[in-house]
């Protein structure tokens, strides 16, 4: 699977509107990331999360250039729906749609107004990092009743205390914390069996 992915992405060039990672022919994952974006340590985190959760369907809140979307698609066989309020990532969306035609879908929308009847096993939250934004994304996510949530930037100095308060507020169970990049946290939805 990674060999196929390597062939697809080895020629991608970095610019502001397309995936900013290169996967060389030797299948080693190599990332060229602007400061503040997900890097190769995050790839290992997402790989671990996929091994723990074995998701069939993932919702991603916050797409940006599509780096994390690609990581979810490489590390799982799940379908992935990505949401973002902005439209600056058109080339990345087109590339992922063409290479993962039955697994990837992108919706440009505000997560606060997102509604779906689809069931998601895992929801990855990396959108609005304000207290109200994270709280709203978790509240919306819990209405979709996923098995797991993942919060990005969990250990970021500006967000950690807020995220911890929100996790406590919704009585969510922390499964694992990842101290890579700005950190991620894997959370179990205790209400879904």
Model regions and ranges:
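A short alpha-helical cap/connector motif
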Residues: 1-124, 128-193
């Amino acid at each position: 699977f990674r060999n196929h992915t390597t062939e697809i992405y080895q020629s991608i060039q970095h610019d502001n509107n397309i995936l900013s990672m290169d996967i060389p022919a030797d299948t080693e994952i190599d990332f060229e990331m602007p400061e503040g974006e997900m890097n190769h340590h995050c790839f290992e985190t997402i790989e671990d999360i996929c091994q723990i959760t074995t998701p069939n369907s993932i919702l991603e809140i916050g797409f940006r250039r599509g780096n994390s979307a690609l990581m979810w698609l490489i590390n799982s066989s799940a379908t992935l729906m990505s949401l973002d309020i902005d439209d600056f990532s058109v080339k990345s969306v087109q590339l992922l749609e063409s290479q993962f035609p039955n697994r990837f879908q992108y919706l440009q929308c505000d997560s606060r107004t997102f509604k779906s009847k689809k069931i998601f096993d895992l929801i990855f939250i990396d959108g609005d990092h304000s207290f109200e934004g994270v709280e709203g994304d978790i509240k919306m996510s819990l209405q979709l009743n996923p098995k797991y949530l993942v919060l990005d930037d969990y250990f970021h100095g500006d967000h950690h205390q807020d995220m911890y308060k929100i996790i406590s507020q919704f009585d969510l169970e922390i499964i694992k914390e990842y101290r890579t990049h700005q950190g991620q946290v894997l959370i179990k939805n205790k209400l879904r069996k």
